[in-house]
Amino acid sequence: MDWGLTYPAHIHSWKWVSYGEPKGFSHYMPYDTHMIGSDIYQTLALVLEHTKKMKVGPGITNPRSRIAPVTANSMATLNEIGPGRAILGISTGNTARRAMGFPASKVDEVRECVEICRKLFKGEEAPYDEGPDRWMKEHRHRYVKFLNPEGGFYNLKDHIPIYVAASGPNMLELAGEIGDGVILFGAIGESFLNYCMEHIKIGAKKAGKDPKKLYILVMTAFYIPKKGETLESKEVKRAVGPFVASSLNLTALALVNTETKKMATAKGEALPADVRKGIMSFSDAYAVEEMGMERRHLKLYSEYLLGWKEEHDPLVTPEMIKTSTLTGSAEEIRDTIHRMESQGVNQVMIQPILDPNQTIDSFHENVISKY
């Protein structure tokens, strides 16, 4: 099992990522959420400079906020700084886009972006299209490629794997089809993880791939309750609640009504019955109307994934905490990870919500060193 760290991209995160490296953490893939955190690529460049072997990449970026040729350039430049240590994590950008008040990218946009980046990473020409839009009246079809591959500007010699993040059935299947790996959000509970893995397998088989060869990474939060604390304690909810709300909101928003094909009336039929109601209760976790459409996201996504919101208290039940996070005794958490490994998971990636160094120390002492 590999161990990783994630966080909203923070320009000073190299300090605690470098602290975590000798304690067994080998990957760092922060969120590329532009209005919430620092710039992802400046953050990752600093991490590469201050670590020895840490593999890094956006966890995740999206094709709407950053066009494919620019993403490919950013990744190839990271690959020059840390040869063989760059991983491209990409998906629809639910949080990054919604934090600006706009919808996420479409599934086909992700497919196209991955195809373009993969060709560019190989030093090949890639087709690239723009328009029509506000500034360009007609559609334009062009070809792009890296023009100075031998100049030390970027590294195309060391392979850059592409991990596709997914929550709903369509993206899970696309991830299995086109990804070198798959990033899952909060897929900890057995039935929930099995639901994800089954859809990943469908996509892999569609592409003629062996699903067992896909690298499966699960992002989550971690907390060992102190004496006297329960899963309903405020201390526990502050420690993992922000991740529970975020990850399960992403899952709920990724589903549509099987009859109307609309998100607004989704019932979550695709989800396992034992967690369906709890997960779908998060569909409106970030929905308030008093500020209006033009500004409501400015309130909704403040402190996103960082601070506890009291309005989420009824949603963050013990069942949902167990479904999406590693919360419990050290032995329970290790047993859960062993079970996840048997289901096909290759890496557990932790987001520190409280003090990063303390979280790293606790996870190392209670999990990594005894696994």
Where are the language model's segments positioned?
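Alpha-helix-loop-beta-strand connector modules within alpha/beta enzyme cores
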Residues: 41-61, 65, 113-116, 120, ...
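Active-site mouth loops of central-metabolism enzymes
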Residues: 1-11, 61-69, 156-167, 222-225, ...
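Acidic (Asp/Glu)-rich catalytic clusters
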Residues: 20-22, 44-55, 75-86, 176, ...
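An alpha-helical appendage that flanks or caps ligand/catalytic pockets
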Residues: 108-152, 193-339
